[in-house]
Design a protein with these regions (language model features):
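Extracytoplasmic
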Residues: 1-196
């Protein structure tokens, strides 16, 4: 179930696209396979320290998972901007506890970045995987489901998934669920036809 090799399976392994994809994932911290987890929260959740900390912790856990190239989320960008507002000092690369300071960090992030919606009630976490092999996607999805099932912040709910890797993961789950019933129907039909 799913892909066994890196690259697009419709193309040859040495195709230009597959070579370019391998180069991008080996040289940069992003990849071409993206699974986006949607964090649903209350309106104006992006200026709530506890909500942003829950999203930052989730992103950190995902970025340390085997098969994940990197993650991008609003909390990480807000930490970078907070440092930028304070002369670029690494000591300030933190989430501010004060809502006014946190507002200063996220105000200039437009909704067109895909990191938040207009009322900050939806905050996507983009997970770039190293490849889209079935085992890699299953590992990422299992970790998201584990975190989702554990007791976390009451105002944050993590939802699977968008992006090309998210669609592939959902397809893999649907195929896995239908595999054995479909085989039973096929073998049953063949057996019934043999008895005729």
């Amino acid at each position: 179930i799913g892909d066994l090799h890196r690259g697009v399976p419709e193309l040859r392994a040495d195709s230009r696209y597959n070579r370019d994809t391998a180069l991008v994932t080996s040289k940069f911290s992003i990849g071409v396979d993206i699974l986006t987890v949607i964090a649903e929260t209350k309106p104006e959740g992006c200026v709530d320290f506890e909500v942003m900390t829950a999203i930052d912790d989730f992103s950190w856990q995902m970025s340390n998972l085997e098969g994940v190239q990197s993650t991008i989320d609003l909390a990480g960008v807000a930490r970078q901007l907070n440092a930028g507002w304070n002369e670029g000092s690494p000591k300030w690369r933190v989430l501010a506890r004060n809502p006014s300071v946190l507002t200063q960090s996220v105000t200039y992030i437009p909704t067109t970045t895909g990191l938040l919606n207009s009322d900050c009630s939806v905050i996507p976490i983009m997970i770039f995987s190293k490849d889209h092999k079935a085992e890699t996607l299953a590992r990422i999805v299992a970790e998201v489901k584990r975190i989702e099932a554990s007791p976390g912040h009451p105002d944050v709910k993590f939802r699977l998934a968008t992006g090309n890797a998210g669609v592939m993961a959902a397809t893999n789950e649907a195929v896995a669920a239908a595999q054995f019933p479909m085989l039973l129907w096929v073998f049953g039909a063949v057996a019934a036809l043999c008895l005729l």
